[in-house]
């Protein structure tokens, strides 16, 4: 009875021990002589979306030189449920690569053997350095097409790529050339001439393409406005269609106006030319007296008074006027009853009135005197 219990215990322990062990074949064990296992070797992990048929112990190469080996491949699940392969690489101690190095699964031979290729990045500057425990993210990994994928794509092209049409193209080309060798011989120099002409105008063609590019950029920036314009275009066309009779009438009226204008110009062109000739003398006179004409324009704002008198009378925003009214009977009688123009014995109005000095010069108190006011000595006119 004791032997039975002892056998059961031994069998249970053996089963538990064997259940905790796993053996994946000889390739799951580190093979002797592979790189990346010597003194100073270190390990890095590469995240790859697709490793194809990459096995463990595959070589790791830098510039076609083996510097390590694949130590293991583990499938890791992302939070969204997708998977990626975490490839552990053992590298020799003399491998110096930046931390942002790129890793690719490459084809070693046409027989299907694969290896992992490590290299510095080419699209950005290298940073940092790979050390033990570093990780190369999935963004820095890639895979070259395998031999099977290349032959599969080639089979698709051959079978379903319409390669058979190539025979028809060759046959049609032969029929076009057969019997017309002379024309095609002359065609070659013409093509050479055309090519030379295009070569001479290559800068103009480039400028035209640049201009087209700028126009395209402008249209791209205003695509919203163009879209709105195209949306409103049907309504505009509809309005034009509704008013097409009025538009036709307007153009017909414009035609009649053009005919009348043409007739008037034809009948009056001689007179119009003579008028222009006669206008030359007027324009010439204005040009000759342009300085005096411009100076005379100053009098328009103060007519009939000269501007220098206005400047003396007007100070600021106010006009100072001093007026003396003589309403005596003697002055009224002399003014209204003794100034008949046709009576030579009566004094005239210009002999009685004395305008201000600042308006017409020193003429005050010069009644009846035949003298030039500008030649009278100062003080004489005012009675001094």
UniProtKB/Swiss-Prot annotation:
The keyword rRNA processing does not apply. GO terms for biological process: intermembrane phospholipid transfer; symbiont entry into host. InterPro entries: Mce, Mce/MlaD, MlaD_Phospholipid_Transporter. GO terms for molecular function: phospholipid transfer activity. It is found in: Cell membrane. Lipidated upon expression in E.coli. Residues 1-20 form the signal peptide. A lipid is attached at residue 21 (S-diacylglycerol cysteine). GO terms for cellular component: peptidoglycan-based cell wall; plasma membrane. A lipid is attached at residue 21 (N-palmitoyl cysteine). The keyword Signal applies. It is a lipid-anchor. Keywords: Cell membrane, Lipoprotein, Membrane, Palmitate, Signal, Virulence. NCBIfam families: Mtu_fam_mce. PANTHER family: INTERMEMBRANE PHOSPHOLIPID TRANSPORT SYSTEM BINDING PROTEIN MLAD-RELATED, LIPOPROTEIN LPRN. Stimulates the host (mouse) immune response; lipidated protein produced in E.coli stimulates T-cell proliferation in mice previously sensitized with LprN. Spleenocytes from these mice produce increased amounts of TNF-alpha and IFN-gamma, as well as somewhat increased nitric oxide levels, upon subsequent challenge with LprN. Previously sensitized mice infected with M.tuberculosis have an exacerbated disease response, suggesting this lipoprotein may down-regulate the host's immune response. This is Lipoprotein LprN. The gene is lprN.
């Amino acid at each position: 009875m004791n032997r039975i219990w002892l056998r059961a215990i031994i069998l249970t322990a053996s089963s538990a021990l064997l259940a905790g062990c796993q053996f994946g074949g000889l390739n799951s064990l580190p093979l002797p002589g592979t790189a990346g296992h010597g003194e100073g070797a270190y390990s890095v992990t590469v995240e790859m979306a697709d490793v194809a048929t990459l096995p463990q112990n595959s070589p790791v190469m830098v510039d076609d030189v083996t510097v390590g080996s694949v130590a293991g491949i583990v499938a890791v699940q992302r939070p969204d449920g997708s998977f990626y392969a975490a490839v552990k690489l053992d590298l020799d101690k003399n491998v110096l690569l930046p931390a942002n190095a790129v890793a690719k699964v490459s084809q070693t031979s046409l027989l299907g053997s694969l290896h992992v290729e490590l290299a510095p990045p080419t699209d950005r500057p290298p940073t940092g350095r790979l050390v033990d425990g570093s990780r190369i993210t999935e963004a820095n990994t890639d895979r070259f097409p395998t031999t099977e994928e290349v032959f599969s794509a080639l089979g698709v092209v051959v079978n379903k790529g319409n390669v058979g049409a190539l025979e028809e193209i060759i046959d049609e080309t032969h029929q076009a050339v057969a019997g017309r060798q002379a024309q095609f011989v002359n065609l070659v120099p013409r093509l050479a001439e055309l090519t030379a002409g295009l070569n001479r105008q290559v800068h103009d063609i480039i400028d035209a393409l640049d201009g087209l590019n700028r126009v395209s950029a402008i249209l791209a920036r205003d695509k919203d406005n163009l879209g709105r314009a195209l949306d409103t275009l049907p309504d505009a066309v509809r309005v034009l269609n509704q008013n097409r009779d009025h538009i036709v009438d307007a153009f017909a009226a414009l035609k009649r106006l053009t005919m009348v204008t043409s007739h008037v110009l034809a009948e009056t062109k001689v007179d119009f030319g003579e008028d222009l000739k006669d206008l030359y003398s007027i324009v010439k006179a204005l040009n000759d007296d342009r300085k005096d004409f411009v100076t005379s324009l100053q009098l328009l704002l103060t007519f009939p008074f000269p501007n220098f008198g206005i400047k003396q009378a007007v100070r600021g925003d106010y006009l100072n006027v001093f007026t003396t009214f003589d309403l005596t009977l003697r002055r009224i009688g002399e003014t209204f009853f003794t100034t008949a123009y046709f009576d030579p014995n009566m004094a005239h109005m210009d002999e009685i009135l004395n305008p201000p000095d600042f308006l017409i010069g020193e003429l005050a108190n010069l009644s009846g005197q035949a003298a030039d006011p500008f030649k009278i000595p100062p003080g004489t006119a005012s009675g001094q």
